[in-house]
């Protein structure tokens, strides 16, 4: 059986470069977006991204990477609360892939 715990993200071992840390952030945001559409409406995901961008990037003047990080924190919390409350997935029960049968959504604007 594989270890279900998350691996240590870049930046914590002291051996990764900043480029590797940014690549990890990009991969993680894309992966959570792909999973989130199985549990939350696409429109909600895009609204969270757009509001995060407006607040953190436009109003607060933070970097794109920091904005992605704050967005990731919000989406992770939404996924956690969904699972904790035994939320039903858009495609049926927890763990089932379904709901949106099309290709995964494009990343939110600015993540390309």
UniProtKB/Swiss-Prot annotation:
Superkingdom as given in the UniProt entry: Viruses
A Pfam family reported for this protein in Swiss-Prot or TrEMBL: VPR
Coiled-coil region(s): none
GO cellular component entries: host cell nucleus; virion component
Biased composition (Gly residues): 90-101
Region annotation Binds to human NUP153: where it falls in the sequence: 61-80
Subcellular location, record wording: Virion; Host nucleus
Gene Ontology biological process terms from the UniProt entry: symbiont-mediated suppression of host innate immune response; viral life cycle
Main localization, broad class: virion
Subunit structure: Interacts with the P6 region of unprocessed GAG. Interacts with host VPRBP/DCAF1, leading to change substrate specificity of the CUL4A-DDB1 E3 ligase complex. Interacts with host NUP153.
Descriptive protein name: Protein Vpx
UniProt source species: Human immunodeficiency virus type 2 subtype A (isolate NIH-Z)
């Amino acid at each position: 059986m594989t270890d279900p715990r998350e691996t240590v993200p870049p930046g914590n071992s002291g051996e990764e470069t900043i480029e590797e840390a940014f690549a990890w952030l990009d991969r993680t945001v894309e992966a959570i977006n792909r999973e989130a559409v199985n549990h939350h409406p696409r429109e909600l995901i895009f609204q969270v991204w757009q509001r995060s961008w407006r607040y953190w990037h436009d109003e607060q003047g933070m970097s794109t990477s920091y904005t992605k990080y704050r967005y990731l924190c919000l989406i992770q919390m939404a996924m956690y609360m969904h699972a904790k409350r035994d939320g039903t997935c858009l495609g049926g029960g927890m763990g089932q892939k379904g709901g949106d049968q099309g290709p995964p959504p494009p990343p939110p604007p600015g993540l390309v």
